[in-house]
From Swiss-Prot:
<keyword id="KW-0689">Ribosomal protein</keyword>
<dbReference type="InterPro" id="IPR001857">
    <property type="entry name" value="Ribosomal_bL19"/>
</dbReference>
<keyword id="KW-0687">Ribonucleoprotein</keyword>
<comment type="similarity">
    <text>Belongs to the bacterial ribosomal protein bL19 family.</text>
</comment>
<dbReference type="GO" id="GO:0003735">
    <property type="term" value="F:structural constituent of ribosome"/>
</dbReference>
<dbReference type="GO" id="GO:0006412">
    <property type="term" value="P:translation"/>
</dbReference>
<dbReference type="InterPro" id="IPR018257">
    <property type="entry name" value="Ribosomal_bL19_CS"/>
</dbReference>
<dbReference type="InterPro" id="IPR038657">
    <property type="entry name" value="Ribosomal_bL19_sf"/>
</dbReference>
<dbReference type="GO" id="GO:0022625">
    <property type="term" value="C:cytosolic large ribosomal subunit"/>
</dbReference>
<comment type="function">
    <text>This protein is located at the 30S-50S ribosomal subunit interface and may play a role in the structure and function of the aminoacyl-tRNA binding site.</text>
</comment>
<protein>
    <recommendedName>
        <fullName>Large ribosomal subunit protein bL19</fullName>
    </recommendedName>
</protein>
<dbReference type="InterPro" id="IPR008991">
    <property type="entry name" value="Translation_prot_SH3-like_sf"/>
</dbReference>
<dbReference type="Pfam" id="PF01245">
    <property type="entry name" value="Ribosomal_L19"/>
</dbReference>
Length: 138
């Protein structure tokens, strides 16, 4: 491992120390919570910055794994229009990533969904079976 890879691994460890990034891929529906700064002007003319969280839920149509510059592209339909937004995976702006549904697809990049709408843009759902553990009372 060269110096740059080692430096990137250290930075990734620092950025993910207080948040957990789930394992997801193209075809999964995710809910990304992002920190947003709102700027407002008070009555006395001073500017006030407030931080709030904004959720963005949509289908992952592409994922790019490149160390600290990894990113993923999320597409959703808002008011009848397709909206795509790229998120940097390890960005401090991204507060949390939650997987809502797991999808079954045969491609790594789902750019063909841009040309589809309605039923033809649906993705089959992949069901995850979690093994239940039995507790034994002594």
């Amino acid at each position: 491992m060269n110096i740059i890879d080692h430096f990137e691994q250290e930075n990734i460890a620092k950025l993910t120390a207080n948040k957990q990034i789930p394992d997801f891929k193209a075809g999964d529906t995710v809910k990304v919570t992002v920190k947003v700064l709102d700027r407002s002007i008070e009555k006395d003319g001073k500017e006030k910055l407030t931080e709030r969280f904004q959720a963005y839920e949509g289908l992952v149509i592409a994922k790019r794994n490149r160390g600290i510059t990894s990113s993923f592209l999320v597409r959703k339909i808002s008011h009848g229009e397709g909206v795509e937004r790229r998120f940097m995976t390890y960005s401090p702006i991204v507060h949390s990533i939650n997987v809502v549904k797991y999808g079954v697809v045969r491609r790594a990049k789902l750019y063909y969904l841009r040309n589809r709408s309605g039923k033809s843009a649906r993705i089959k759902e992949r069901h995850i079976h979690i093994a239940k553990t039995k507790t034994v009372k002594a």
